[in-house]
From Swiss-Prot:
This protein's encoding gene: L3
Site-annotated residues for Cleavage: 52-53
Catalytic residue positions: 55, 72, 123
Name of the featured protein: Protease
Organism for this UniProt entry: Human adenovirus D serotype 17 (HAdV-17)
Keywords: Autocatalytic cleavage, Disulfide bond, DNA-binding, Host nucleus, Hydrolase, Late protein, Protease, Thiol protease, Virion
Lyase listed as a keyword: no
Length: 209
């Protein structure tokens, strides 16, 4: 197994205090945030459930500022998300805007830097970490808060550069330490989770094929 299962992510997110605001892990068919007056968040896979999943993203809705946050651990642009994963979220945003805003307008803020290594399978865990930041600091979840300040972002264009691999490896180590402090579920299943989400997991899978 590689990556994180829906059950694992839901258990970790509950441990992180996101339960009341959290939609269960879902797929690219996520309808959007339809209860517009409430803080809400979700972890969404770029593929359908029948595929086994490909890549996890996190979304957060802050009704006070009418802002939708989209967190991608790789920091890909909209164009790259569509190119690599065939993932588009414009329809979800439109449904959220119609349901959540009297004037049908909202702001979108998305991550633009890379915090995850190119061969890492920890995207779902990074999303859990972001949602902890979102729930506790909903007006500044991307950075400038104690949770996300543990990570160091690098320009997305350097994702494949050997120069940034030590930084991205440290990010994954910080991620595991953070979850070990805050999630009993992670502590109980740490060995299996770290094996499935290893920093070089995708490289391991390519070699074994």
């Amino acid at each position: 197994m590689s990556g994180s299962s829906e059950r694992e992510l839901a258990s970790i997110v509950r441990d992180l205090g996101c339960g009341p605001t959290f939609w269960a892990p879902t797929t690219q068919r996520f309808p959007g945030f339809l209860a517009g007056d409430k803080l809400a968040c979700a972890i969404v896979n770029t593929a359908g459930r029948e595929t086994g999943g490909v890549h996890w993203l996190a979304f957060g809705w802050n009704p006070r500022s009418r802002t939708c946050y989209m967190f991608d651990p790789f920091g890909f642009s909209d164009r790259r998300l569509k190119q690599i994963y065939s993932f588009e979220y414009e329809a979800m945003l439109r449904r959220s805007a119609v349901a959540s805003s009297p004037d049908r307008c909202l702001s979108l803020e998305q991550s633009t830097q890379t915090v995850q290594g190119p061969d890492s399978a920890a995207c779902g865990l990074f999303c859990c970490m972001f949602l902890h930041a979102f729930v506790h600091w909903p007006d500044r979840p991307m950075d400038g808060n104690p949770t996300m300040n543990l990570l160091t972002g690098v320009p997305n264009g350097m994702l494949q550069s050997p120069q940034v691999l030590p930084t991205l490896r440290r990010n994954q180590e910080e991620l595991y330490r953070f979850l070990a402090r805050h999630s009993p579920y992670f502590r109980s299943h740490r060995a299996a989770i770290e094996h499935a989400t290893a920093f070089d997991k995708m490289k391991q899978l390519r070699v074994s094929q």
